[in-house]
Each structure stands twice: as C-alpha cells, then as structure tokens.
Amino acid sequence: MTRQWPAPAKLNLFLYITGRRADGYHLLQTLFQFLDYGDTLTITPTADGRIRLMNPIAGVAEQDNLIVRAARLLQRHCFAAGDPAAPGADIQLEKVLPMGGGLGGGSSDAATVLVALNAQWLCGLDVATLAQLGLSLGADVPVFVRGEAAFAEGIGERLTPAAPAEKWYLVAVPPVSIATPRIFGDPELNRDAPQRSLAQLMTAPFHNDCEPIARKHFSAVEQHLSWLLEYAPSRLTGTGACVFAEFDTEAAARQVLSQAPAWMRGFVARGVNVSPLHRALSGAQ
C-alpha cells in the first residue's frame, strides 16, 4: 500500500565545538529540535526487490543518494542476498528543504526511509537498531530515526532526550549551499568551547560556534542574519546556510516574514519535540 511520510527539518538551537579527535572528527554539544515542516516521501512497496527513486535529484548520483542508500541498507539487513521474497520500493520525493542549508534534509530523508520501510516491509526492527543503521549513513540520521528532540554529544552520536520550549521560527534560506567540511575545516573555527551540562547550557544564551565562520565567508548568510537580528534573537543552524529567528507566537513570526525584503526567501514553522515522522508512524499502527 502506498503511504506518504514526512521528513521534517531540524534546527540546532545551539552548537558548541568542544574539541577535535585524532581522526579529524569534531566533538560537539548541540541541541536538536524538529520543525513541523519538511520534505515528503511517497513510498510504494513492490515485489521485485528493486529500489527506485522515481524523481532523482539533479547532480546527485544514485549511489550517493541517501534515500536509495538507506533503502538498500535496510533491505540487506532484513533480507538475505538473492532472496526472491525480498521486497523493493518505489519512492517519490517532494523536496522543499534546501541542500547545504543546515536543516538536515538529506539525513531526515534517509531516516524516514528507514522508519517507513521498516514498517511497510514488516521488518520489525526496534528504534535502536534502526538508529545504529542510520549512523552508518550520517551522524545526524539517528536523531531523526529516534524522533525526539535531543541533546547530542561526542561527534553527534550520543543522544539524550530533551524538551526545549516549542517556539515558532522564521527560517531564512540564503541562496547559497554550504558544505559542512567548508566550515569545520576553517582554521579560525573555535574548537575549545568548555564542556557543560545540559542544565548549564539551557540557562545560558544560545550560540552557534560555526556562525562567525559562515558570516565571514558567505555574504548572503551575513545579510540574512543581520536582517533577522533587527527583529528577534536569531542564529545559524548547523553549519548553515539557513538562519532562524525565534518567536513566542505564529502571528509574530508571520508578521516579520510579511516585512521581508524581496531578496529574502523564508518560511514559518513551529519547533516540535516529537518528530512529525513518529506521529505519522503512530497513526499507521
């Protein structure tokens, strides 16, 4: 049976770089929250064992596409190689989240495929197993698989459930894509933030250590963030390029969006601590 599944965006409400491992991976402390806004995947299980993305993303080879990789990973885990009973899937992507935006679009798409096909193929894997599979696809995939707002440590793999205030956000989308290595590889990036407990971090002003680098090297990020800061507390999410302003009400966020200059593209969404994907999963069971 064909089903539609949400692949929500995330925000990093704060992001601190606390060190770097010998293998080059950065150690961090960050707070993830979902948005009630994102991509949509329409998935139809098939009997032929083939994984088909019906509308491939321009410029992304199939073997590099996280949607296809996630489906094949789950297929290999749940069914023996060459098993004639192994199901396939036709997957249609409605893409609204920008690539290189810091909203987790690719990771969220991959997580949605894992969670959705686990249900539709009747694999019966628990969320911990799915999250472990997801980690092999990317450090942000497990938080989307688990579906709870979370405090992340280590390289992002150590997750503690959290419950930040569910505010409204105006997210601005600068016309630029920022690759994570571009920011993490910058010699000026602050990598020695003090490690603090979640309780300490929740009572301190929120900050993103990647923000000064993104603002310095990407004029569009600087322009969009400077505009938002005139109206509300605003920050970079992830390594960018998207920036967000926080509001207590939807009306306040939409009022500011209505004043946005012609060069600014953005949207209003609510922060939620339970992923829309998991609400959809509960509704399907």
From Swiss-Prot:
Instruction: Write out the catalytic residues in the record.
Output: K10, D140
Gene3D superfamilies attached here?
A: 3.30.230.10, GHMP kinase, C-terminal domain
Q: Which residues form a coiled coil?
A: none
Enzyme Commission designation: 2.7.1.148
Q: Pathway, according to UniProt?
A: Isoprenoid biosynthesis; isopentenyl diphosphate biosynthesis via DXP pathway; isopentenyl diphosphate from 1-deoxy-D-xylulose 5-phosphate: step 3/6
Q: Name one GO molecular function term.
A: 4-(cytidine 5'-diphospho)-2-C-methyl-D-erythritol kinase activity
Which keywords does the record carry? ATP-binding, Isoprene biosynthesis, Kinase, Nucleotide-binding, Transferase
Q: Which reaction does it catalyse?
A: 4-CDP-2-C-methyl-D-erythritol + ATP = 4-CDP-2-C-methyl-D-erythritol 2-phosphate + ADP + H(+)
Signal sequence extent = none
Q: Which GO terms describe its biological process?
A: isopentenyl diphosphate biosynthetic process, methylerythritol 4-phosphate pathway; terpenoid biosynthetic process
Residues that hold ATP according to the record: P98, M99, G100, G101, G102, L103, G104, G105, G106, S107, S108
- Write down the superkingdom of origin: Bacteria
One Pfam family name is: GHMP_kinases_N
- The enzyme class is transferase
- State the function annotated in the UniProt record: Catalyzes the phosphorylation of the position 2 hydroxy group of 4-diphosphocytidyl-2C-methyl-D-erythritol.
Family, as annotated = Belongs to the GHMP kinase family. IspE subfamily.
User: What subunit structure does UniProt give?
Assistant: Homodimer.
Q: What is this protein called?
A: 4-diphosphocytidyl-2-C-methyl-D-erythritol kinase
